């Protein structure tokens, strides 16, 4: 099945909000084996929406709309689709009662235009809105399925997962299982990873292998279909094994796992604590770690040592090192890692120093990075990197490289 997603709302065209609904729906439809070939964004204009629908009808078997189901005059999705399909709009009594109950519960006066939110396409399947007022709806006519969903993500996402997805699975007449798995990699570019497994991607039709890139990471989505859930998972296992035989050294996790989540998880498993001295990253590393539930079990603390004075007075980096080697140097990174570990009584000390830009520093180019790792068992190691990108990209990639290094150290040094 081929699909098109039409997002309705002038605020999207004006760039006032991001179209996260299309991203969410594309991901979920891919898991169902539905091909999303087009994303369309239309402002609050009935004529242009009608034009977009006619284009979509010529190239898609499933058209999903987000937005335009509200009570105001510029909420015109239902009216436009009803006119195009020759369907009347009728009141859904359950939705109307829910809207009336909301206004009564909040002690507010319900204006007449709010009844508009209870209007649905005659003959459609109602998708309940358990997080808002306007229900969604779905209907199939002339071999095309139309699904109308609310615009707010907090309403749209749970509605689709609970009611929209089952509707589509029934429409597909699908008794086979669709299993999906995301493999996450760091330290390898998308082009290199794809080159390393190009023949696997070309040969695979079940499961399919789709590369995904973002924020200095690469992911592969594997999607398998089979009448048996067990057999579908076996197909995924076989494909995963073939991929990891080639690029396994860059692999770190599955699905929605992040490098920061994996780092906290492994520190817990190994019963190790960590402290950080952050110059280049300015606290970003510990901010990301401590956003993970349970991080308090493994994070001892840290120092944002942006100024050389702090490096010297708090973390005891000698002035001679800062003068001779520089703040952006292997020696400075080494001392920062060792001294923050001692200061915070942690098992592992990590340091970040470098040049994020936009200008060079101490004669070193933008993207120069040093990451120090100190443990009681081993001599402190310093990793020198040359990272591409703008300032923010360099900082987040540096923090992620720190996680990657820690994960490898934990796996190698603390087995068992």
From Swiss-Prot:
Gene3D superfamilies per record: 3.30.70.2860, CinA-like (3.90.950.20), MoaB/Mog-like domain (3.40.980.10)
CDD domains in alphabetical order: cinA
InterPro entries: CinA (IPR050101), CinA-like_C (IPR036653), CinA_C (IPR008136), CinA_KH (IPR041424), Competence-induced_CinA (IPR008135), MoaB/Mog-like_dom_sf (IPR036425), MoaB/Mog_dom (IPR001453)
Pfam families xref list: CinA, CinA_KH, MoCF_biosynth
Superkingdom of the source species: Bacteria
Family the entry assigns: Belongs to the CinA family.
Name of the molecule in the record: Putative competence-damage inducible protein
Species of the source: Geobacillus sp. (strain WCH70)
Lineage start: Bacteria, Bacillati, Bacillota, Bacilli, Bacillales
């Amino acid at each position: 099945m081929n699909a098109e997603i039409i997002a309705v709302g002038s605020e999207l065209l004006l760039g006032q909000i991001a179209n996260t609904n299309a991203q969410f729906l594309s991901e979920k439809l891919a898991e169902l084996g539905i091909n999303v070939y087009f994303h369309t964004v239309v402002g609050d204009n009935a004529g242009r929406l009608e034009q977009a629908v006619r284009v979509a009808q010529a190239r898609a078997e499933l058209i999903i709309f987000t937005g335009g189901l509200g009570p105001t005059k510029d909420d015109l999705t239902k009216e436009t689709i009803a006119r195009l399909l020759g369907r009347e709009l009728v009141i859904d009594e359950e939705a109307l009662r829910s809207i009336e109950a909301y206004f009564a519960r909040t002690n507010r006066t319900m204006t007449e235009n709010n009844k508009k939110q209870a209007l649905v396409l005659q003959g459609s399947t109602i998708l309940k809105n358990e997080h808002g007022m306007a229900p969604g709806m779905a209907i199939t006519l002339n071999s095309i399925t139309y699904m109308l969903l609310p615009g707010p993500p907090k309403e749209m996402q749970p509605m689709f997962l609970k009611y929209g997805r089952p509707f589509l699975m029934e429409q597909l007449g699908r008794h086979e299982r669709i299993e999906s798995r995301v493999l996450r990699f760091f330290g390898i570019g998308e082009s290199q990873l794809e080159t390393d497994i190009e023949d696997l991607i070309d040969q695979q039709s079940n499961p399919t292998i789709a590369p995904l890139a973002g924020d200095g990471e690469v992911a592969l989505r594997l999607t398998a279909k089979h009448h048996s859930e067990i057999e579908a998972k076996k197909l995924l296992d076989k494909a995963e094994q073939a991929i990891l035989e080639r690029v396994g050294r860059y692999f770190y996790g599955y699905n929605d796992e992040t490098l920061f989540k994996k780092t906290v998880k492994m520190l817990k498993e190994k019963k190790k604590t960590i402290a950080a001295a952050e110059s280049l990253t300015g606290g970003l590393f510990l901010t990301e770690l401590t956003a993970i539930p349970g991080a308090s079990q493994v994070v001892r603390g840290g120092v944002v040592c942006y100024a050389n004075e702090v490096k010297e007075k708090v973390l005891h980096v000698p002035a001679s090192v800062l003068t001779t080697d520089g703040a952006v140097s292997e020696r400075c990174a080494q001392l920062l890692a060792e001294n923050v570990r001692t200061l915070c009584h942690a098992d592992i000390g990590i340091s970040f120093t470098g040049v994020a830009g936009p200008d060079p520093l101490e004669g070193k180019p933008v993207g120069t990075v040093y990451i120090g790792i100190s443990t009681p068992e081993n001599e402190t190691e310093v990793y020198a990197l040359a990272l591409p990108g703008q300032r923010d990209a360099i900082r987040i990639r540096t923090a992620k490289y720190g996680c990657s290094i820690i994960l490898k150290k934990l796996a190698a040094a603390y087995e068992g």
